[in-house]
Amino acid sequence: MKALITGASSGLGRDMATVLSEMGYDIIAVARREDKLKELQSELKTDVEIICCDVTDNDQCIKLAKRASEVDIFINNAGFGVFGNFDVTDLDTELRMLDTNVRALHILTKLVSNTFKERGYGHILNVASLAAFFPGPMFGAYYATKSYVLRISQAVAEELRQAKSSVKISVLCPGPVHTEFGDVANVNFGNGTEKATKHLVLTSMDVAKYAIRKMLKGKEIIIPGAIMKIAVFLRRILPDKTLAKIVYLIQSKKCIKK
């Protein structure tokens, strides 16, 4: 058994690699930071191949997708966010985020699902976010990218069902998680709202364990945490305008790092 994971150098990707390794899976760990990948390689018990790859490069993405024939599970985890009002966030950084969160995932999902379908089996796990269900003022472009991840995953999963394929696609939609995400997004999550939100933030390992368990059971939309499931339910009954105001109130309490 073998799994390939992008964004495997830290956080959720690293922990999912650890969980799968403990279950006996060999790992192909993909990220840009070779030093972090080597650390992971030295820690895991099963065989670990490391690939230094920038998924914003289309050619590297296409080359990476060719490894799908070797694996049972392909996890699209690479991604990051940009925090701040839309009129002041850096355009180049946002475009790089779109390339990472949307373009790369689109390429890999398309090519890997085709390989899996021709072969007759395989499971893709795309990492979205609870943000996929909501409008996201002060995090607008990031929220929009995760909506794309959710909807393309649902659409392709249904196409595979209609084709009577054994290939599965799951999409992980976690709420706040303790990872490097806040550092990359240049925001302190919890500042100003720490007392109200600290019990909502899950550990990366808890989310990784839950995600892998549910994925292997064939769950399509995976939402860790009871409170996060309630949030998605409320999203169904509240108008988007109201939700946008609520999200803005939450986001405006976050402190941009200096």
Briefly describe each language-model feature range.
Residues 52-63, 91:
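The beta1-alpha1 cofactor-binding region of Rossmann-like NAD(H)/NADP(H)-dependent oxidoreductases
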Residues 129:
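Residue(s) in the substrate-gating loop at a strand-loop-helix junction
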Residues 159-226, 241:
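SDR active-site lid
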Residues 23-39:
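Conserved glycine-rich Rossmann-like NAD(P)H-binding loop of the short-chain dehydrogenase/reductase
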Residues 85-98:
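Substrate-binding pocket helix/loop in short-chain dehydrogenase/reductase
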Residues 9-10:
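Conserved glycine-rich cofactor-binding loop
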Residues 109, 145:
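Active-site helix of classical SDR
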